[in-house]
Amino acid sequence: MKRLGSVVLALVLTLTLLPGKVRAAGPEVAAKSAVLMDVETGTLLSEQNAHEPLAPASVTKVMTMLLIMEAIDSGKIGWEDTVTASEAAASKGGSQVYLKVGETMTVSDMVKSIAVSSANDCACAMAEHLAGSEAAFVEQMNTKAKELGMNDTNFVNCTGLDDDPQAASHRTSAYDIAIMSRELLKNHPDIKKYTTIWMDTVRGGAFGLSNTNKMVRFYDGCTGLKTGFTSGAGYCLSASAQREGLELIAVVMGSENSKDRFAACKSLLDYGFANFSLYTPALQEGASVPVKLGTAESVAAVPGGAVSLLVDKAQRGSLTAEIELAESVTAPVSRGQRLGTLTVKAGDQVISQVPLVAEREVVRLNILDLWKILLRRIAMAK
């Protein structure tokens, strides 16, 4: 192996400065629980009773939207498919667009109504459309929660309504809300086309929608995500925002009033943007390995996967990366074959090591090609 030297980190890395750790507590906010999480890496940047199971109200619909987006992105359903409202959907209380039994609406307008106006009737209609019944859909919600490691969560319905005795066990935590919010934003970014709408209409302009998340209008870079309120849950919010490539999720549960929940999320997001950065530099040009007996003389070495480095701004100047590559490699070389290592450091502390792999395949020269090369070298030696 050969060392190519230290370079200032300028590579899109998916690492965290303190992997698996929570930074020192951020601002204390007026809520029963709260968290601040980085979307790219999943790093928890601030917490306040993060794992306390509480009623989430309509923030539940983050999971509802996640399952809808999975169905759309997998091709199971399309944006222009029509959804028919059942009696169960039309009879949902709380926030709604007042669907009538038998009324049809496109998936796009259903999602818009859920994301912007927190429409319970549309959430139920989509649940039935995807799973056959709300109960079956709730099973899928809980299955997905387990897959994501949401260990504080038990869903009873797809809306977050707590007017049913069974809803007493409908619980999740601020941490789990951040987990599902991150999954939605990171892997299904098209949802932002809806969660960033301030005002819009459905039914051909006949019914107006106004976003319940006022941060969409008043917080710079806001990308969503979902409000919630019931008398039992209090005021809840999962708020996301992106600035200079860094996207954060702030979750608060159990605030006493709407003003407090927005102020709490603003405080958390402000703290995150003031103290953290996401680095995306490019690997030093010429990071390649010579290839013996190959159809190409060398192969470029690239990171073995998408990577991002979340750092404390106070340590920004101390970040370096050391690249170590093989002296050479013999063909055939497969795409993704390991060629070396990129070691990321903050001062003398090793933060993480990333494999460097072959960017493309290099085929081995055939016998005829080898003979031609040999004869050429003999001729040049005369």
Language model features with spans:
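Domain-terminus/edge residues, biased toward the C-terminal soluble/receptor-binding domains
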Residues: 150-151, 168-382
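Structural motif marking the loop-to-transmembrane transition
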Residues: 1-5, 56, 107, 367, ...
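Sec-dependent N-terminal signal peptides of Gram-positive bacterial secreted proteins and lipoproteins
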Residues: 2-23
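Hydrophobic alpha-helical segments, especially transmembrane helices
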Residues: 3-4, 62, 243
